Amino acid sequence: MNFEGTYVAMVTPFTDDGNIDEEGFRSNINYLIDKGVTGLLGAGTSGESATLTHEEHRKVVEILIDEVGGRVETVAGSGSNSTHEAIELTKSAEELGADAALVITPYYNKPQQHALIKHYQAISDATDIPIIAYNVPSRTGVDMSVETIVELAKIDGVDAVKEASGSVNKVSKLYKALTKEGLEEDFNILSGEDGLTLPIMALGGTGVISASANVDPKRMVLMVDSILNDDYTRAQELHYEMIDVIDALFIESNPVPAKTAMNIMGLPAGPLRAPLTDMKDENVEILKNALKEADLI
């Protein structure tokens, strides 16, 4: 499967009593589709997947696929620090009809590089759904090397990587290594760092899985489309229009600022699930100022 464009890592809205806000989630899905996004990710990091029960995880993916109704691509988060559990979650995503699965590297147990390859190979062997590997060492404690990602690209069914190591140099080396192996046409690099999406795409990336697009989808879509159309002047303008909001959205742990911003903007988000909690007052003011300057409130 080819991944190109703007994918939104959706938040999971909750009601005041802590349940999934199905009506709000469906509303957000339609709001984002109306803004022109390529695809939507449910039950990812931005969706507070770590604190969803298995039943809630499945419900989020079910609602997503049902409400989208084939209008855009659907991606289900299905990673775990247990290979067995990751296989079961990925099977569930496939059974529910998701177009792809986003599989984060195992976290906390810090598997070796060769173990990461075996992990993704096992998931691919057990399923037929396209897999996007997710490299985010700041959260997992393990950073997939360029060499490891190239090996993943050789696995049938692993079609892309969401690269969130924060290193543009690494993306350069990765694209060069993929090209050397003749894999660059069949394996996509997707930005996992909203503020680095422009340089990552300029170096061979084909899109973004964006948390900030929950808050400012229109500009992100326009920037990504501009890059894909080789209009880097317009892309640069949009990047600078967004960058202060992007920075403010990561001033505390994602999705704390994103849900705060959405609540301020009147979009369904609701409360956070413990252990995440409300933003510090001074950071809320920084966020509000960024939203005002970007004409989002």
From Swiss-Prot:
The record marks T45, Y108 as: Part of a proton relay during catalysis. It comes from the Archaea. It is an enzyme of class 4 (lyase). One of its GO terms (biological process) is lysine biosynthetic process via diaminopimelate. Keywords: Amino-acid biosynthesis, Cytoplasm, Diaminopimelate biosynthesis, Lyase, Lysine biosynthesis, Schiff base. Its EC number is 4.3.3.7. Pyruvate binds at S46, I209. It catalyses: L-aspartate 4-semialdehyde + pyruvate = (2S,4S)-4-hydroxy-2,3,4,5-tetrahydrodipicolinate + H2O + H(+). One of its GO terms (cellular component) is cytoplasm. Pathway: Amino-acid biosynthesis; L-lysine biosynthesis via DAP pathway; (S)-tetrahydrodipicolinate from L-aspartate: step 3/4. It is found in: Cytoplasm. GO terms for molecular function: 2-dehydro-3-deoxy-phosphogluconate aldolase activity; 4-hydroxy-tetrahydrodipicolinate synthase activity. Its main location: cytoplasm. Gene3D superfamilies: Aldolase class I. SMART domains: DHDPS (SM01130). Belongs to the DapA family. PANTHER family: 4-HYDROXY-2-OXOGLUTARATE ALDOLASE, MITOCHONDRIAL, DIHYDRODIPICOLINATE SYNTHASE. HAMAP family: DapA. Catalyzes the condensation of (S)-aspartate-beta-semialdehyde [(S)-ASA] and pyruvate to 4-hydroxy-tetrahydrodipicolinate (HTPA). Homotetramer; dimer of dimers. This is 4-hydroxy-tetrahydrodipicolinate synthase. It comes from Methanobrevibacter smithii (strain ATCC 35061 / DSM 861 / OCM 144 / PS).
